[in-house]
């Protein structure tokens, strides 16, 4: 994390320096006046044609005059927009279309078609659940009352879900959409309009990046100098790579967690059935853990994308397409650095979400085994307080160590639960620990004792 913080600090300083330099270049009164005249000539095509004709007729005397320079710049800007590369335009159009097509209704229809095939399996599991519950009610009448209530509620839930799977799936998808809309609600559009979703902000940024890359690629195509054309093409590739990386990562953080949550909730009834089988309850715990992890990424990713989209839109200069014509390298580095900084800040969400997920799992399932330092500490504590078989074997003697090691270190017995429901809950949460395996007994006979008579030591005075 130290290296990542240094990278973020360096990118932030570079953005600040580039922004100050770009602002200083824009605030120059001579350049501002030139930009205004270029815009006027770009709008007035007749005057621009007259100036270009006069400059071409007398290139020796009027080539370096401001009017000729402004007319050529206006003509170049007009040509750059008209001569955008078809491949780049198509690529960004496909990306924007993919963002627009990731609509909730399409996702809902796909999930409904996918899970509708599981309806016979849901009916079979529901029938098996009813039969098992009836068998338990008839064969084991000593069950506590809460056990019957829990299983009756489980049967009712699974039966209702099996009778109306489409309505259940539509409710799940609508709930996930409402949660995603509520998470992205506080973030407004850069121009002060009403609140919009994160996909709309990414679509607007994709359109802006498409215009930038088309302008740079068009200048590279129209430049007669090969060296300058290569420079323009490199600038276009830098902007396309940085903007494309930001768009892909932001879109994945917006779409993938919601899709995973919807799929897990749609398959929830199948995992609820597993609560009846003690050996399969860990699958339900794994399903709950995956659902919590996806909800954490959804709760952190959607606001982060909205916030960074607003920051990125506010940090980018307003007249960036015009600056690409006057100062392409500085404008390219400014746009690329801002996009790279936003991408790195999104990447820091992964360890943050992992730590939050680990904390939630420790709070929700305190007795479950967790990977990492917590499990290592628990294993070390168990080894510290466990009886030591080596000391007991040494006390038993060298020959009886293998035979009586198991009896010298008895295995701790499982504590008897106070009532069956407590044992059921403890086993379901993973709190009940099986006793450790007994030490393997050495059934070989002990060696015969040495009965030889040893010489006695003389009694010396």
Swiss-Prot record:
GO terms for biological process: protein secretion by the type IV secretion system. Residues 1-24 form the signal peptide. One of its GO terms (cellular component) is plasma membrane. Residues 376-411 have a biased composition (Low complexity). It is found in: Cell membrane. InterPro entries: Conjugal_tfr_TrbL/VirB6. Residues 376-461 are annotated as: Disordered. Residues 439-453 have a biased composition (Basic and acidic residues). Keywords: Cell membrane, Membrane, Signal, Transmembrane, Transmembrane helix. The chain crosses the membrane at residues 118-138, 232-252, 253-273, 294-314, 333-353. It is a multi-pass membrane protein. It comes from the Bacteria. This is Type IV secretion system protein PtlD homolog. It comes from Bordetella bronchiseptica (strain ATCC BAA-588 / NCTC 13252 / RB50). The gene is ptlD.
